[in-house]
């Protein structure tokens, strides 16, 4: 069968193992061809090709439900569900999404992008099925890295107490998340990977009893209990965690043996109640470079298939904000043993891999457990350490209660560095860092800031660690501005103080963080039209530099705020609120991300669509204030506030 002819996964039914293995080769070929050309997640999907084929052999996806955790391993699923022809548009504007989206396909039963949600969602579907008297299978596919998340364990705890609810969890154990997984559960799973399949030991005992003349067909409960004891004795501790939580444990099964997995899934579907099938896979299977470097090939930009090397950018770029942060933190840790870096399974992405390599004793990876990371840091701060939590903006929102309850209320000196703040591009709405400004500015005792460039990032990190209270620092994805960096000796900033970058009399532009450089370019565009603007680098969201901003606003009378975050409750809202509190009557135009989802596209494409490029912002400012040669003196905009 040609993969290009598959539009429905039920077309796999009836194929021989050899035919399915041929389809597996075609999936890997298409997967590699597209990702090597346009970039995307590589290792996760390559590791679950056979798993996907075997599972879909045993399901009727016109009715049955499959929830893929996170979604970055679901490229084979997409190729089997009618998206082969469009797969070249993967993660591109208006193309196939990199994660699952209910709006994209009827086979995407639950959208995702963050880890550890699949078991809860699939269990919810199973309960809805039973309450409505329907009959279909519900399956969650979750990786061993995502299983470290508290939400996944909460769902397992719940499902295990529902013995009459048929429900299947497939544990895709590749011994990796993005970085190698950590913790006792991961260690336990690693031991299990190398153990004999446990359910088949139980099955063998029961089959032997069934063959006993006269009594075999009537297996008493005592014999069933005995088989459970044999399982525990034969393979000590293997699967015991899940068995004790109420699941029937099956495995570990070779995740690249289609026939064995098909038999296992068929057997699992016949068991009533919750079942966990443990499948051992290799991340990056079938592509030697991805198998050898499973962290580096988790996700890739465009690369050469023959050499495995990334295709270099045509123009050299400055170091990324993440790298500058990591390098600076290493320098600080070398001088202060009380500073500790904490990550939630994102060491490489946040730059903390540099600290891990340089000073491992001052580095902690808690796994995919953002809530735990925040409260762990709070506990460390209670006893004299200076923890620095480096977490993506989109993932930190998972620990909102801990930010308030465990850090903010207790006024503890924990520093949060929010990487990927703002528009991140091809990963789409689940990964945009557009909400941290709004949710952090509401938390008491927090000092919140964002740098205009990588040199200011260095000073802000020192500022955070010099402050006796909770601090948050947002940095964007991608390269810095290319400014000169100091190796050491960074002076802390005065908290709550911004700076004037240029002066003009017609307009006051107040920009925050990554929007400062675009604000300066916007001012130059306006200057070409004879409009002079004062540009302020706000530096701080909380507290605002009202002593700088308010007198200028009163004098100039026209104010524009710029932020790379949602306008609802954002930086612009903070400015407008401060004007209202002081009865400052000015006309204010807020520029940022409107009340909408930002879908997958390149960051530049998203900014163009949102009107966040310097040219677009200059044009909109001229329209807003009647400087566009129109007859109207005043063009209203939905983002405008007049105080």
Curated annotation (Swiss-Prot):
It catalyses: D-glyceraldehyde 3-phosphate + pyruvate + H(+) = 1-deoxy-D-xylulose 5-phosphate + CO2. Keywords: Isoprene biosynthesis, Magnesium, Metal-binding, Thiamine biosynthesis, Thiamine pyrophosphate, Transferase. Thiamine diphosphate binds at residues 72, 113-115, 145-146, 174, 287, 370. GO terms for biological process: 1-deoxy-D-xylulose 5-phosphate biosynthetic process; isopentenyl diphosphate biosynthetic process, methylerythritol 4-phosphate pathway; terpenoid biosynthetic process; thiamine biosynthetic process. Its cofactor is Mg(2+); thiamine diphosphate. Signal peptide: none annotated. Pfam families: DXP_synthase_N, Transket_pyr, Transketolase_C. One of its GO terms (cellular component) is cytosol. The keyword rRNA-binding does not apply. GO terms for molecular function: 1-deoxy-D-xylulose-5-phosphate synthase activity; magnesium ion binding; thiamine pyrophosphate binding. It comes from the Bacteria. Its EC number is 2.2.1.7. The keyword Amino-acid biosynthesis does not apply. Belongs to the transketolase family. DXPS subfamily. Homodimer. This is 1-deoxy-D-xylulose-5-phosphate synthase. It comes from Prochlorococcus marinus (strain SARG / CCMP1375 / SS120). The gene is dxs.
């Amino acid at each position: 069968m040609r993969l290009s002819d598959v539009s429905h996964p039920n077309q796999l039914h009836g194929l021989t193992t050899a035919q399915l293995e041929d389809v597996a080769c075609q999936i890997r070929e298409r997967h590699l061809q597209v990702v090597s050309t346009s970039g995307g997640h590589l290792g996760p999907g390559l590791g679950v090709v056979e798993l996907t084929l075997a599972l879909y052999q045993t399901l009727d996806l016109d009715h049955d439900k499959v929830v893929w955790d996170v979604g970055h391993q679901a490229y084979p699923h997409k190729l089997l569900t009618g998206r082969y022809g469009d797969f070249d548009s993967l993660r591109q504007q208006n193309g196939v999404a990199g994660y699952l989206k209910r709006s994209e396909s009827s086979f995407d039963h639950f959208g995702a992008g963050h880890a550890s949600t699949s078991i809860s969602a699939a269990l919810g579907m199973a309960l809805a099925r039973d309450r409505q008297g329907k009959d279909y299978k519900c399956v969650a596919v979750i990786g061993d890295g995502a299983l470290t998340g508290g939400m996944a364990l909460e769902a397992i705890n719940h499902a295990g107490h529902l013995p009459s609810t048929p429900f299947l969890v497939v544990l895709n154990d590749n011994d990796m998340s993005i970085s190698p997984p950590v913790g006792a559960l991961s260690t336990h799973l690693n031991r299990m990977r190398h153990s004999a399949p446990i359910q088949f030991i139980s099955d063998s005992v029961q089959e032997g009893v069934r063959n006993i003349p006269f009594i075999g067909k009537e297996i008493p409960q005592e014999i069933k209990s005995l088989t459970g004891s044999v399982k525990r004795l034969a393979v000590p501790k293997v699967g015991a965690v899940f068995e004790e939580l109420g699941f029937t444990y099956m495995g570990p099964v070779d995740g690249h043996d289609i026939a064995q997995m098909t038999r296992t899934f068929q057997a699992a579907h016949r068991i009533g109640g919750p079942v966990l099938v443990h499948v051992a896979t290799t991340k990056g299977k079938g592509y030697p470079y991805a198998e050898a470097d499973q962290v580096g090939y988790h996700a890739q930009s465009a690369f050469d298939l023959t050499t495995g090397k990334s295709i270099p950018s045509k123009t050299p770029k400055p170091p990324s904000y993440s790298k500058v942060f990591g390098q600076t933190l290493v320098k600080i840790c070398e001088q202060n043993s009380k500073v500790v870096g904490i990550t939630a399974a994102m060491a490489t992405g946040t730059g903390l891999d540099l600290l891990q390599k340089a000073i491992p004793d001052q580095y902690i990876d808690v796994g995919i457990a953002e809530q735990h990371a925040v409260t762990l840091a709070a506990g460390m701060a209670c006893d004299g350490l200076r923890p620095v939590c480096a977490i993506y903006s989109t993932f930190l929102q998972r620990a909102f209660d801990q930010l308030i309850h465990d850090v903010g209320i207790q006024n503890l000196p924990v520093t949060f560095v929010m990487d990927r703040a703002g528009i991140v591009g091809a990963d789409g709405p689940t990964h945009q860092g557009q909400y941290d400004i709004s949710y952090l500015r509401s938390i008491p005792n927090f000092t919140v800031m964002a740098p205009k460039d990588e040199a200011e990032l260095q000073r802000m990190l020192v500022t955070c660690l010099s402050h006796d209270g909770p601090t948050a620092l947002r940095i964007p994805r991608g390269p810095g501005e290319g400014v000169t960096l100091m190796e050491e000796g960074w002076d802390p900033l005065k908290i709550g103080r911004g700076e004037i970058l240029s002066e003009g009399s017609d307009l006051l532009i107040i920009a925050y963080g990554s929007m400062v450089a675009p604000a300066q370019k916007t001012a130059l565009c306006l200057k070409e039209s004879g409009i002079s603007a004062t540009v302020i680098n706000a530096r701080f969201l909380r507290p605002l530099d009202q002593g700088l901003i308010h007198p200028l606003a009163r004098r100039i009378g026209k104010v524009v705020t710029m932020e790379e975050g949602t306008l609802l409750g954002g930086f612009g809202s903070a400015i407008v609120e401060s004007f209202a509190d002081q009865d400052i009557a000015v006309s204010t135009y807020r520029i940022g991300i409107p009340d909408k989802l930002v879908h997958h596209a390149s960051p530049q494409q998203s900014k163009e669509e949102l009107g966040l490029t310097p040219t677009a912002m200059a044009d909109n400012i001229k329209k807003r204030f009647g400087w566009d040669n129109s007859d109207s003196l005043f063009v209203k905009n939905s983002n405008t506030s007049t105080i």
